[in-house]
């Protein structure tokens, strides 16, 4: 097979920025088969597979890419499916540039192989062309409960179901999917794709109990007692939003990014028939610089805002959001106000947001995170007229589970403490992973935690 030594990735087709910023349809349109084969031939099949070491779920990346290069897309899917239960999701939202693609040898001098784009292509091809029922393993007679139907919980559920466990997933919201459903906009991750992944788990025998808030409706002790579960996996995520404690933060027109995106993504607040409409306003300031901030800003634009600012205390180079998401936001007309930080949100006579006062920042010496610390420039305050403020400053785990589970150790941030990478907690038979343990992180890292915990749960039950 001849290699393709083009220094750049095959470009991803996308909607025109001036069209897509007015709709919620997916921005990236995906590779054609010809594009996928051509991009796959850029892989030089390193013997030590550095890309695989960057994948939290351990996909054999050179093997699946080799099948793509040969045009055998179903074989490529089967390789991915051995390690990942959500390839169509990961191909769209994982930060490949800091994981698998960040380890790619081609990326040392040129652009890395488009691993994420190829994973998405393979998953979409399988979804559209293969309609066989999943293999349901014989029951092994054991029951496991999963708390939370997000990436960690879905992955653990899938891996345990493949081993014959009777798995029930308890989800607090009215639909399964967790952050994949409520946190990531349709234009980045179509919900039909997430739903199809969940439907696949149902076909494998996984049960989903929605509107079940563990810690209120039931406790972990009850699940392991009268309900008879031999182990419980806590993958309840981190959905408690953080704020800055600014004057004016309680004004009407101030949202957490969590609430704003949940209303838009899960409750379809952009439809005229929505029972939970969002008052977006005409000028919106989004405080923060991560992927969630980009999602909130780009959603606000699509909801009718005329001007949307990203307010971030460091510079463009320090933005934690994926490079691709920043580029898409810039193309769509989002204005980046970097090296500034809000100090007050000002009210109008009607009690709604009227403006936001910020102070200019400069970068000092590196802090504990390794990034240069932002320092206020005295006397540099300025005010921007805005009528909506969205705070995107991260999230913490909900305290319900830790407050209703005696003996479950948590740290000062409210995250569940686990031993090693297997997710074992201070309570026997209780495992945890994903954002409930790490705080807000990536989808693929949560999946990796769910996968490791499923393996540990299987060993625990078999050795009881």
Question: Where are each of the predicted segments found?
Answer:
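Local cysteine-cluster metal-coordination motifs and their immediate loop/turn environment
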Residues: 41-63, 85-108
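N-terminal Rossmann-like FAD-binding beta1-loop-alpha1 element of flavoenzymes
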Residues: 142-168, 293-301
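Glycine-rich dinucleotide-binding loop and its adjacent helix/turn
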Residues: 122-138, 196-216, 241-303, 411-421, ...
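FAD-site-proximal beta/loop scaffold in flavoenzymes
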Residues: 250-281, 366-440
């Amino acid at each position: 097979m001849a290699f393709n030594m083009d220094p750049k990735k095959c470009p991803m087709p996308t909607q025109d920025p001036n069209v897509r910023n007015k709709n919620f349809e997916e921005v990236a349109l995906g590779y054609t088969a010809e594009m996928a084969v051509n991009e796959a031939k850029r892989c030089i099949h390193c013997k030590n597979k550095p890309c695989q070491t960057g994948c939290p779920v351990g996909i054999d990346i050179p093997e699946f890419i080799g099948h793509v290069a040969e045009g055998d897309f179903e074989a490529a899917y089967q390789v991915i499916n051995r390690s990942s239960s959500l390839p169509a999701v990961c191909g769209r939202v994982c930060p490949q540039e800091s994981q698998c693609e960040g380890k790619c040898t081609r990326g040392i001098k040129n652009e890395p192989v488009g691993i994420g784009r190829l994973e998405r292509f393979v998953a979409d091809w399988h979804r559209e062309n293969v309609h066989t029922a999943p293999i349901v393993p014989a029951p092994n007679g054991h029951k496991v409960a999963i708390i939370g139907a997000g990436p960690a919980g879905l992955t653990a559920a899938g891996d345990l179901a493949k081993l014959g466990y009777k798995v029930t997933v308890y989800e607090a919201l009215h639909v399964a999917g967790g952050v994949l459903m409520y946190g990531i906009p349709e234009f980045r991750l179509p919900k039909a794709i997430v739903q199809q992944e969940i439907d696949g788990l149902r076909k494998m025998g996984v049960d989903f109990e929605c509107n079940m808030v563990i810690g209120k409706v039931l406790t972990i002790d009850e699940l392991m007692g009268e309900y008879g579960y031999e182990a419980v996996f806590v993958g309840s995520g981190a959905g408690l939003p953080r704020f800055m404690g600014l004057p004016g933060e309680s004004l009407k027109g101030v949202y957490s990014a969590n609430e704003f995106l949940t209303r838009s993504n899960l409750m379809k607040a952009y439809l005229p028939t929505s029972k939970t409409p969002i008052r977006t306003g005409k000028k919106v300031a989004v405080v923060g610089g991560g992927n969630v901030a980009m999602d909130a800003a780009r959603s606000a634009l699509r909801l009718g805002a005329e001007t949307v600012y990203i307010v971030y205390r460091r510079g463009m180079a320090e933005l934690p959001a994926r490079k691709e998401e920043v580029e898409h936001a810039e193309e769509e007309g989002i204005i980046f106000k970097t090296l500034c930080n809000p100090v007050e949100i000002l009210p109008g006579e009607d009690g709604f947001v009227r403006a936001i006062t910020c102070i200019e920042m400069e970068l000092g010496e590196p802090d504990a995170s390794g990034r240069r610390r932002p320092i206020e420039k005295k006397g540099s305050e300025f005010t921007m007229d805005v009528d909506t403020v969205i705070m995107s400053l991260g999230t913490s785990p909900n305290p319900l589970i830790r407050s209703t589970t005696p003996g479950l150790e948590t740290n000062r941030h409210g995250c569940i403490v686990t031993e090693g990478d297997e997710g074992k907690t201070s309570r026997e038979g209780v495992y945890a992973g994903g954002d409930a343990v790490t705080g807000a992180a990536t989808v693929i890292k949560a999946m990796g935690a769910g996968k490791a915990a499923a393996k540990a749960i299987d060993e625990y039950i078999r050795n009881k």
